[in-house]
């Protein structure tokens, strides 16, 4: 078997590179090269929607790029600051080698991130904190500093939660056509998902909110 299939926490890596299980408390693995910090929209570059007709019919198919003022497109991780409808935010975004912005689940090296699918003016931004996934219906925790997905026991807000550190069966599959991960509706627990109202592999019971008492 390809090592990316074995090691990617139950999800194959569809864009090359070596997958990984992550693990521990989810410390940062984000800065792996190709990063651009502190870009101001309107000064250092501007957004461009490359497929407006398709995106109007299906917003999730939107293909955004960030054109740099000095030429070319942003690639890899980029920290963008801009204002939308009176709200100013600064956050990390990731762009593929062709400059198209990534969204949804994203694997960088051995670390998983979630890039917003919310069309609220900040589509594609790195999500931090608790994330309830609309596809598999499960909860995940993304580090509030690095955005890296947590696995195993994590102390969050003074409480302990258990986030699945293994995935014996693949549950998410990469769609090369859309460049996005999709849940395969497999009867197996996804990597990183929170245990709820059950006993963890090491014998501790967590309640319906995932909290160990």
Spans of features found by a protein language model:
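Extracellular adhesion/carbohydrate-binding repeat motifs centered on closely spaced tryptophans
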Residues: 1-213
């Amino acid at each position: 078997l390809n090592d990316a299939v074995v090691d990617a926490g139950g999800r194959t890596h569809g864009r090359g590179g070596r997958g990984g299980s992550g693990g521990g408390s989810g410390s940062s693995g984000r800065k792996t090269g190709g990063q651009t910090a502190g870009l101001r929209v309107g000064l250092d570059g501007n957004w461009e929607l490359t497929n407006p007709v398709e995106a109007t019919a299906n917003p999730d198919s939107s293909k955004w790029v960030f054109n740099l003022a000095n030429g070319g497109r942003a690639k890899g991780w980029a920290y963008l600051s801009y204002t939308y409808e009176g709200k100013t935010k600064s956050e990390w975004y990731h762009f593929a080698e062709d400059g198209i912005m990534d969204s949804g689940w994203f694997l960088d090296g051995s670390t998983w991130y979630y890039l917003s699918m919310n069309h609220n003016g900040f589509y594609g931004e790195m999500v931090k904190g608790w994330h309830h996934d609309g596809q598999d219906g499960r909860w995940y925790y993304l580090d509030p500093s690095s955005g890296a997905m947590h696995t195993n026991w994590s102390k969050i807000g003074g409480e302990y939660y258990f986030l699945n550190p293994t995935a014996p069966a693949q549950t998410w599959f990469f769609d090369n056509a859309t460049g996005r991960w999709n849940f395969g509706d497999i009867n197996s627990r996804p990597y990183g998902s929170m245990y709820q109202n059950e006993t963890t592999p090491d014998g501790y019971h967590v309640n319906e909110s995932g909290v160990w008492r």
